[in-house]
Amino acid sequence: MNKKILFIPLVAFLLLAGVFATQLMKNSAGDDPTKLESVLVGKTVPEFRLEDLAEPGKLYDQSIFKGEPLLLNVWATWCPTCYAEHQYLNELAKQGVKIIGLNYKDQRDKATQWLNDLGNPYLISLFDGNGMLGLDLGVYGAPETFLIDANGVIRYRHVGDVNSRNWQETLAPLYEKMLAEAKQ
């Protein structure tokens, strides 16, 4: 009887260890936690009215996403990864990539100073101080970047920083495809 009681915790431990090992193997085999699906892919940007970051009172709505393909970059000064990606966004903007910034759950004065100090890659900088547009977009945190086509439809969501590797491998081909489609 004593041996059976000792055997039960051993079996439970081995089962848990097996589940844990399976999940580790699955993650190491290529499941990328930054590739989060978005229910908004294939849908238009949600309706909103937000102020310009630098010009309080100047309002924008979702119509700013129509006309040409662009990136919507969700960022904040409290986000260390946003700081790491910012220089690369400046480079992309210099190359002609159209980027709109969404300052997410931040302080306006800190965000404005950030852009003054580090450069401003954004055509428009939206201020989402309470995070409502971010919530509507399904943002988990910053940075996140959405590729939006000329019709205002979200085509791709990237979680994490934009850097030369993921730009060249994933984002640039999608952006170039959207540019080609917009010219047709």
Swiss-Prot record:
Residues 39-176 form the Thioredoxin domain. GO terms for biological process: cytochrome complex assembly. Residues 26-184 are periplasmic. GO terms for molecular function: disulfide oxidoreductase activity. CDD domains: TlpA_like_DsbE. Residues 1-4 are cytoplasmic. Involved in disulfide bond formation. Catalyzes a late, reductive step in the assembly of periplasmic c-type cytochromes, probably the reduction of disulfide bonds of the apocytochrome c to allow covalent linkage with the heme. Possible subunit of a heme lyase. This is Thiol:disulfide interchange protein DsbE. The lineage of its organism: Bacteria, Pseudomonadati, Pseudomonadota, Gammaproteobacteria, Vibrionales.
